[in-house]
Regions:
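A surface-exposed partner-binding patch
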Residues: 1-79
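Intrinsically disordered, low-complexity regulatory segments enriched in Ser/Thr/Pro
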Residues: 80, 85-97
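Short conserved micro-motifs at the rims of enzyme active sites and ligand-binding pockets
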Residues: 78-81, 101-103
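Generic hydrophobic, helix-prone segments enriched in Leu/Val/Ile
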Residues: 9-14, 89, 111-114
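Compact, glycine/acidic-enriched structural inserts
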Residues: 92-114
Length: 114
């Protein structure tokens, strides 16, 4: 998984602030630390055996989505689209056949809270 500058900035802020729980709109979110980020991709970018789950098919996990944490109430993934210069942040319901992202903010809003 390639490391993006904004993701690196987020991880650095988490490390220095020691804060991993934030609120973004109505969502309470746990953010992954540097040590948790790679493991946090399991079940989304790839399975536990490192087999890719990425596909360009509609409703499948996209290459440009990086999981940065999870919504603490339901455990749904919180992820950023690294191909968009605004670095929008989404969540989507786990356990469904298709991923249907819901926009909840952007990465700069998260960084400002740390």
């Amino acid at each position: 998984m390639k490391q993006q500058l904004k993701i690196a900035e987020l991880l650095k802020r988490i490390e220095t602030s020691k804060q991993q729980d934030i609120e973004l709109g109505t969502y309470e979110i746990y953010l992954f630390s540097q040590n948790e980020l790679e493991k946090g991709q399991i079940g989304y970018r790839y399975d536990k055996h490192q087999n890719s789950l990425i596909s360009e098919e509609n409703g499948k996990w996209k290459e440009e989505w990086i999981v940065i944490g999870y919504e603490t109430d339901m455990g749904d993934p919180v992820f950023v689209n690294i191909d968009d210069d605004a670095y929008p942040v989404y969540t989507a319901e786990r356990g469904t056949e298709l991923w249907q992202p819901v926009h909840i903010g952007n990465i700069d809003e998260i960084i400002k809270q740390l």
